[in-house]
Amino acid sequence: MKSSRIAAVLCVVAFCLAFAAQAMATKYVALGDSYSSGTGTRTFYEPSCQRSVYAYPYLLHEAHTSWTFVNATCSGATTASLLASQVSSVTSDTNWVTYTIGGNDAGFSHVITECALPSWASNCSGAINEAQTIIKNTLPGRLDTVNNEIKSRAPSAKVIVLDYPRLFNGEDCNAFTFFSSSEEARLNETADLMKSVISAAATRAGANFTFRDVIPAFIGHAVCDGGSGSSTEWISGLSNPTGESYHPKVAGHANGYYPAVHGVTG
């Protein structure tokens, strides 16, 4: 009888310890657009959203294999689609959240497509002006909505908010694009504007939100740095398929984005 009681007690203790361990498990949720899913790396384990094992969320997962990892990122995501189909992955037991968002709200793809055309066939300046107006006047409120929704779902979660790199170095080495140096400068200025808006929104969100700037890491590694397709170039220029264009390559995630998030999570 005594041995059976001891066995019962041990079973209860083991159950409690297992339950406690499960309750304390760290949960990491990755949200965001193509700069988080891994478009540009050319290798996807979930093709419909272009989620890659080479993207920074997966690299962070590999550094913390004991964590529960939920990858809700999806290429093409906007603030609206993040709220509609991604943020539900954030639950009260979430410990870490990362995201990039806002580029598609500003019409990033349209702007790049317009500015890549010859000057006589495009309205690059108008496209940039329109994007900058959205970034300044519309995006702040949308980012606040995203951040408030994350906070309401996981009040204790630590949230790492990332920006977008400057794409260009002042030259165009691709055969079928026609970016002028002045257009590249304005596009880089738009990345800087995006940075300031994203950073300000993260600050407004409170102490649990940390903004990480990736722009410095990509200096010297923009499109055409070292020549098209070189190892120095961490961002793809015009690519085939075209959807891979103007996104971080494997090296951009490994050396640009991943250190930014890992520097916070450890």
Task: Pin down the residues of each PLM region.
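Bacterial N-terminal signal peptides that target proteins for export
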Residues: M1-V9
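Structural recognition of the beta-strand scaffold that forms the well-ordered cores
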Residues: K27-G38, T68-T73, N95-T100, D105-G107, ...
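Oxyanion-hole/transition-state-stabilizing segment in secreted/luminal serine hydrolases
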Residues: T39, S81-I135, R166-F168
